[in-house]
Amino acid sequence: MGDPKGFMKYAREGPKRKPIELRVLDWKEMYEPIAEDKLKVQGARCMDCGVPFCQGSTGCPVVNLIPEGTELFDRGRWEDPTKALHTRNNFPEFTGRLCPAPCEGACVLGINEDPVSIRVLEWNIIDRGFNEGYVEPVLPVVKTGKTVAIVGSGPSGLAAAQQLARAGHSVTLFEKSDRIGGLLRYGIPDFKMEKWVIDRRLEQMKAEGVEFKTGVTIGKDITGEQLRKQFDAVGLTMGAEQARELPIPGRELKGVHLAMEYLTQQNKRTAGIAVTDEPITAKGKRVIVIGGGDTGSDCLGTAHRQGCLEAHQFELLPEPPPSRSSSTPWPLWPMQLRTSHAHEEGCDRQWSISTTKLTGHNGQVTKLHGNRVKFEGGKFTPVPNSDFEMDADLVLLAMGFTGPVKNGLLDSLGVKYDQRGAVSVDESFMTNLDGVFAGGDTKRGASLIVWAIAEGRKMAAGINQYLQTGKSAKQSVK
């Protein structure tokens, strides 16, 4: 550690957002650059703990070398911390920008003070590493002659593909959309991560030998069985795209859309891609977002930049406490109130709200009807005399995802599911089908980007063992 007393001398400083009046005018990333001297001060706050909980079981899922990387950064040698990040994380530029940072929730300094700004350090280290030319293709020593198909190009599929290509296998990654990236490409707004960040990494992967095929829907254009016959192993990383619906009267009205329908359209517009579906825009409209998570926040930020008239966000759950709840003691991820960039930009945010119906005129939504609820005895019950209605021109459903889409490839293959509806696998991430593996949200259910990367790496390890031995980890034990 560069300064043994740094954690006592310096206050936490996170990434600084651009002024609201400026950042809502465009789709550029909303954070301002941080000077190197300020980054070093933040790095000096790391205590180099004997037991670094930040990279433990309740911290970083990919087990980033956080104290080690911070120490190397403090020495001013950008190449070394760049390499340290890549030993555990294929895409620190993604997690540095998008991860909620469970590592910071588990930071020992966070027990009594604000935690170390780990995420902003990671972000700046990897971007500097790219700029300095320290991120280069990693080519295998030998080629195995084995072939692998990865279905789905989100962070899990990308991580698995890169790991397997580096192990010497021939990897083909299939994506149903017109561009690689999955949810990163069309689900995350550019003001959180501009898409050149993805393209920059894809160039490295292409040089490493990964073959990308877009516009191919496995299960339709190519059947699952055809894929199994063509490749020695198959990895399923299609995410958890089955959105949670709102089965209430009025759901069919125009102006009521799933969050991903809305976000995908704007991401395509930002990329200069023509939108052929009926346009969904918040310009000049009264917008209500149902769902209080990150996706809901992304909808709000998008609505602000499109020029909405007003914005509201309703959450079914009660308002979290302002600081760490006793139900999530350190080093667990703290349950507490968080205010996002979109909330700063303007939003009427309400908790304990249940939407009961939507009404409209000439087929277009005009009002949302709901009531307040309280959570008692394990269920939500309406608060007496709390019914209300609110004008609405655009209602966006951002209530999360229930799991992978089963109808199509998964059902046709005959994979088994667990009790949550995700694809069931053994300890090597193999499904009930020989040579067919699953990882990321397809296997875990909707989760964090850092978990997707971790699962992609683990699935790749399982596939690699299978290709080398012809057996999964479970089969090898028998």
Show where each model-derived region lies.
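Beta1-alpha1 glycine-rich phosphate/pyrophosphate-binding loop at the start
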Residues: 5-32, 44, 63-75, 82-85, ...
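Ferredoxin-type iron-sulfur electron-transfer modules in oxidoreductases and energy-metabolism complexes
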Residues: 23-42, 64-97, 101, 112-142, ...
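A conserved FAD-binding loop/helix module that cradles the flavin
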Residues: 296-300, 442-467
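Short cysteine clusters
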Residues: 46-60, 95-99, 103, 107
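FAD-site-proximal beta/loop scaffold in flavoenzymes
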Residues: 252-284, 376-446
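Beta1/beta-strand and adjacent pyrophosphate-binding region of the FAD-binding site
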Residues: 143-156, 282-293
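Feature captures the FAD/FMN-dependent oxidoreductase FAD-binding
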Residues: 142-143, 147-151, 199-248, 356-370, ...
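C-terminal catalytic lobe of FAD-dependent flavoproteins
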Residues: 4, 13, 18-37, 42-45, ...
